[in-house]
């Protein structure tokens, strides 16, 4: 019998890196809402009393970046110095943006596929490798450790926003360790929650007593509600529960650590359970295959698992800048496939159009911000881009494609 423990982490929307991801994607939403053909590569940096946005944007949209940045920071919960030391109203907002390089624009606008098909004429915005993954551990076909970590992080933010626990502050992290037997989850080994909090908790000032109180409240208001509908639940008797292991977490957010767009790419994807091509998502328009092709790879992998062609699937795609068709496609089913991996790879090549233009069209990636009232990508920037059940993501809707694939068996 093979036994092992696998661990994944998530972070809340108030984590410094996640503030930056949300700022970058809010800028992307604002540009695409007014001009769906906008080219955006927006990075953000936060530090004590400062938010900088930089990168390259070519767009007809008129965006008040200063106002937008402050609105994002305020919505996360940093409304005054007492909300964790970072204040949306008084922090400095610096803007240093250029236009997209004409060399890159040429490669995207005029792909070298020598075809009259409009979808062949949209080249990849850069070279790179992207991975997509799915497995049957959860209903949303995600690995259980990252799914649980996100559930806890979302719930942690919710109880703060709703003031069910009124001493919590925006910064926080979760980590879940799951025990496996023969590749199947069998128990929740450890849950770790680190959450920023006020220096005084309901009149309690002694560090050890504060830690005990926080642990009690988090189990009742976060852990139990976040896992109540799961067949595999944490148990007080057997699941190790760690809360703020250093003793206290008062200084947090940008006051405690600088943040940067694109530094939580494992949190954004599969929690380390599958490989990663290295490219971040936030702040990038859909012509950047780091983002759009990673979404497509997830769609492919999830469709294959949903069609019962395998229990676990990883899909690798690769692209060259200015070229529409993928350079390579590879499927690995880890020995769980109903057919060979080479047959699955051929099936993907035959049944999925993975050109950037086709991906953008199929998922409507350039129009979704305007269709959703000016906000789409920003909602993906915290709590993961895959397996979401709280927002509608087109690359997660594989029901029709899975049905089509099932008929091919």
Swiss-Prot record:
Coiled coil: none annotated. Its main location: cytoplasm. Gene3D superfamilies: 3.30.300.10. Keywords: ATP-binding, Cytoplasm, Magnesium, Metal-binding, Nucleotide-binding, One-carbon metabolism, Potassium, Transferase. One of its GO terms (molecular function) is methionine adenosyltransferase activity. Mg(2+) binds at residue 17. It is an enzyme of class 2 (transferase). ATP binds at residues 15, 171-173, 248-249, 257, 263-264, 280, 284. It holds the Pfam family S-AdoMet_synt_C. Signal peptide: none annotated. InterPro entries: ADOMET_SYNTHASE_CS, S-AdoMet_synt_C, S-AdoMet_synt_central, S-AdoMet_synt_N, S-AdoMet_synthetase, S-AdoMet_synthetase_sfam. GO terms for biological process: one-carbon metabolic process; S-adenosylmethionine biosynthetic process. Binds 2 divalent ions per subunit. L-methionine binds at residues 56, 100, 257, 288. Pathway: Amino-acid biosynthesis; S-adenosyl-L-methionine biosynthesis; S-adenosyl-L-methionine from L-methionine: step 1/1. It is found in: Cytoplasm. Catalyzes the formation of S-adenosylmethionine (AdoMet) from methionine and ATP. The overall synthetic reaction is composed of two sequential steps, AdoMet formation and the subsequent tripolyphosphate hydrolysis which occurs prior to release of AdoMet from the enzyme. PANTHER family: S-ADENOSYLMETHIONINE SYNTHETASE (PTHR11964). This is S-adenosylmethionine synthase. The lineage of its organism: Bacteria, Bacillati, Cyanobacteriota, Cyanophyceae, Synechococcales. The gene is metK.
């Amino acid at each position: 019998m093979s036994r092992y423990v696998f661990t994944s982490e998530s972070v809340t929307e108030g984590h410094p890196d996640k503030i930056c991801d949300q700022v970058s994607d809010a800028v992307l939403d604002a540009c695409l809402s007014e001009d769906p053909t906008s080219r955006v590569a927006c990075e953000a940096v936060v530090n004590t009393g400062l938010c900088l946005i930089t990168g390259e944007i070519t767009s007809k949209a008129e965006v008040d970046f200063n106002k937008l940045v402050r609105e994002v920071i305020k919505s996360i919960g940093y409304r005054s110095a007492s909300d964790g030391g970072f204040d949306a109203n008084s922090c400095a907002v610096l803007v240093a943006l250029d236009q997209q390089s004409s060399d890159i624009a040429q490669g995207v606008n005029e792909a070298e596929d020598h075809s009259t098909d409009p979808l062949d004429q949209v080249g990849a915005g850069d070279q790179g490798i992207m991975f997509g993954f799915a497995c049957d551990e959860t209903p949303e076909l995600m690995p259980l450790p990252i799914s649980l970590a996100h559930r806890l992080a979302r719930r942690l933010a919710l109880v703060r926003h709703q003031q069910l626990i009124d001493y919590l502050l925006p910064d926080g992290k979760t980590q879940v360790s799951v025990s496996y037997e023969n590749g199947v989850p069998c128990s929740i080994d450890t849950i770790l929650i680190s959450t920023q909090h006020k220096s005084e908790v309901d009149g309690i000032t002694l560090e050890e007593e504060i830690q005990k109180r926080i642990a009690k409240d988090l189990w009742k208001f976060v852990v139990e509600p976040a896992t109540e509908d799961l067949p595999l639940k944490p148990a007080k008797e057997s699941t190790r529960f760690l809360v703020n292991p250093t003793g206290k977490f008062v200084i947090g957010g940008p006051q405690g650590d600088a943040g940067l767009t694109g530094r939580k790419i494992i949190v954004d994807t599969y929690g380390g359970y599958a490989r990663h091509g290295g490219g971040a998502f936030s702040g990038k328009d859909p012509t950047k295959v780091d983002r759009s092709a990673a979404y497509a790879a997830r769609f492919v992998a999830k469709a294959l698992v949903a069609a019962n062609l395998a229990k676990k699937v990883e899909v690798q795609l690769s692209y060259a800048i200015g070229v529409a068709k993928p350079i390579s496609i590879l499927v690995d089913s880890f020995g769980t496939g109903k057919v060979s991996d080479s047959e699955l790879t051929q099936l993907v090549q035959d049944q999925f159009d993975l050109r950037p233009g086709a991906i953008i069209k199929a998922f409507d990636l350039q129009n979704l911000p305007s269709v959703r009232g000016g906000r789409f990508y920003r909602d993906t920037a915290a709590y993961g881009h895959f397996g979401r059940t709280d927002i509608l993501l087109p690359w997660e809707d594989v029901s029709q494609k899975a049905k089509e694939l099932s008929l091919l068996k």
